[in-house]
Amino acid sequence: MKRILLLSFLISLIASDMNAQAKRYIFMEHFTNTYCGICGARNPSFYSLLTKYEGNYHHMTVHPSFPYTACTLYQANKTENSLRANYYAINSTPTLVIHGTSKKSLSSVNAAVLDAELNKTSPVQVVVKETGSS
């Protein structure tokens, strides 16, 4: 009888663990350009918004060749920057891609958008370790 109870307990524990939801971090790919005046005007408010979500997102910046190919950060990494921009068919900056599926103009990203993403859960947990200071 004890073995049956123990087995039942273990099975229920495993089943409940399978239904657990892992925290979902917001993954953002931010397409911007150092020579882009609109980017220079919108990026500061975007970064200010992100301070409220510290520890809840992963952010990657990509510098495509437009609107200006003279962008220093594009020039430093032409191949990878171009590949990312082409993959998402990015044709203007600043643009934000969230979770690789939702492409938005940076001006349309606000607390409501980020809160909606944070309210989602994931059945799978992936551990990401960030290095660096920015």
Task: State where each predicted segment sits.
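Bacterial Sec-dependent N-terminal signal peptides
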Residues: M1-K23
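Extracytoplasmic/secreted cell-surface and envelope-processing proteins
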Residues: I38-G40, T69-C71, S105-S108
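Extended polysaccharide-engagement surfaces of secreted carbohydrate-active enzymes
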Residues: H59-R84
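Local sequence-structure signature of Cys/Sec-based thiol-disulfide redox active-site neighborhoods
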Residues: Q21-P64
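A structural detector for beta-sheet-dominated domains
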Residues: K129-T131
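Non-catalytic, surface beta->alpha helical segment in thiol-disulfide oxidoreductase systems
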Residues: Y74-A76, L83, Y87-V126
